[in-house]
């Protein structure tokens, strides 16, 4: 019964791990470096000189999820100098992940579009225009998906990210189930086939030594004392 239960648990863990790992978006080392580059560019933009002649009159925001990617468009009307493109910042709620985007500016209409390569699992994207002080400070686009944890530049945290957010822990659980099953099966074989024979062998010798009476080994042949 115990072996059957372990076998069923192993099968269920294998199916769940396979399904979840197939659905997970694995972040490669190249993508990891891109995240760090986005962070560096974000800091550079924060430290860059900011022009003072931008005015926002009105704005509209649209945000959709299309084909597994998030697309959003901010459209601002007003007066914008040519350098405003370098002052547009799109980021998630933590402020650590800079969302890839494109900016178009004709002086009176400023259009900011999230690239189609942006993942759809960002729950909230904020836009900042500096030095323009918008009425609410920031405008947001909020798709209905879970925000991913974006790793900081640390090898330990990167490994933790791959383990948890790419569902590698399910693989580890599967391995634990498999090894537990194999060890339990080995223990069962030892007790069932080797331990039983050894028990009868010792019982026969002890009986002969202390009683002098003949006994029978049920596994092999009758023994005469």
UniProtKB/Swiss-Prot annotation:
Record-annotated membrane-spanning stretches: 171-191
Keywords from the named record: Disulfide bond, Glycoprotein, Host endoplasmic reticulum, Host membrane, Immunoglobulin domain, Membrane, Signal, Transmembrane, Transmembrane helix
Domain annotation Ig-like H-type: ranges: 54-145
Cytoplasmic compartment segments: 192-225
Single GO biological process annotation from the record: symbiont-mediated perturbation of host defense response
Entries under InterPro entries matching the protein: CMV_US
Residues in the signal sequence: 1-17
UniProt topology in membrane: Single-pass type I membrane protein
GO cellular component: host cell endoplasmic reticulum membrane; membrane
Family to which the UniProt record says this protein belongs: Belongs to the cytomegalovirus US6 family.
Name used for this protein in its record: Membrane glycoprotein US7
């Amino acid at each position: 019964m115990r072996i059957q239960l372990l076998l069923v648990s192993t099968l269920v863990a294998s199916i769940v791990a396979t399904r979840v790992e197939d659905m997970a978006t694995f972040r490669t080392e190249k993508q990891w470096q891109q995240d760090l580059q986005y962070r560096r560019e974000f800091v550079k933009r924060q430290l860059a000189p900011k022009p003072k002649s931008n005015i926002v009159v009105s704005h509209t925001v649209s945000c959709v999820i299309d084909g597994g990617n998030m697309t959003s468009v901010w459209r601002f009307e007003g007066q914008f100098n040519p350098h405003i493109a370098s002052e547009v910042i799109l980021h998630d709620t933590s402020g650590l992940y800079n969302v890839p985007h494109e900016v178009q500016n004709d002086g009176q209409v400023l259009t900011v579009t999230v690239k189609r390569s942006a993942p759809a699992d960002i729950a909230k994207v904020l836009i900042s225009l500096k030095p323009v002080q918008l009425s609410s400070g920031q405008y947001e686009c909020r798709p209905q998906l879970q925000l991913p944890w974006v790793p900081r530049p640390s090898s330990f945290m990167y490994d933790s990210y791959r383990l948890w957010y790419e569902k590698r822990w399910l693989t580890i659980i599967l391995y634990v189930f498999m090894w537990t099953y194999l060890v339990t099966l080995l223990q069962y074989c030892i007790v069932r086939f080797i331990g039983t024979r050894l028990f009868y062998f010792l019982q026969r010798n002890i009986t002969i030594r202390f009683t002098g009476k003949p006994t029978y080994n049920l596994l092999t042949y009758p023994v005469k004392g």
